[in-house]
Amino acid sequence: MGTRAQARFVRVTPRKARRVVDLIRGLPAEEAQAVLRFAPQAASGPVGKVLASAIANAEHNDKLDRETLVVSRAWVDEGPTLKRIRPRGFGRAFRVNKRTSHITVEVAPRDTVGAASAKRKERTR
């Protein structure tokens, strides 16, 4: 089990945030930060903040070295949807859904991530 950080109610659609999270899953933490820094997607900002928070939590709370950390798990859940009205012609109104996300990133030391995935592979065989 690694160290987690979570950002809730982030005003980015879950579908777009998942595209960014898929880029960093399984990468070393330093490399994942570099990937996010140069990713053109708008969701890379909030995901980068969550990753930085997870790294800081691991360093401060668990006394882990940031060079050994790997993004072991990362996922995006759907938050509540803000419903807005857009006025249209002839007195009509269309609904605009402003979606929110809950972004979670978990980092763990490199040696524990490899052992856990090996155990999972043995169980599935």
From Swiss-Prot:
An annotated GO cellular component: cytosolic large ribosomal subunit
GO BP: any one term: translation
Keyword match Ribosomal protein: yes
CDD domains: Ribosomal_L22
Pfam families, alphabetized: Ribosomal_L22
GO molecular function: rRNA binding; structural constituent of ribosome
Protein keywords: Ribonucleoprotein, Ribosomal protein, RNA-binding, rRNA-binding
PROSITE patterns for this protein: RIBOSOMAL_L22
Complex formation: Part of the 50S ribosomal subunit.
Function: This protein binds specifically to 23S rRNA; its binding is stimulated by other ribosomal proteins, e.g. L4, L17, and L20. It is important during the early stages of 50S assembly. It makes multiple contacts with different domains of the 23S rRNA in the assembled 50S subunit and ribosome. The globular domain of the protein is located near the polypeptide exit tunnel on the outside of the subunit, while an extended beta-hairpin is found that lines the wall of the exit tunnel in the center of the 70S ribosome.
Name the record gives this protein: Large ribosomal subunit protein uL22
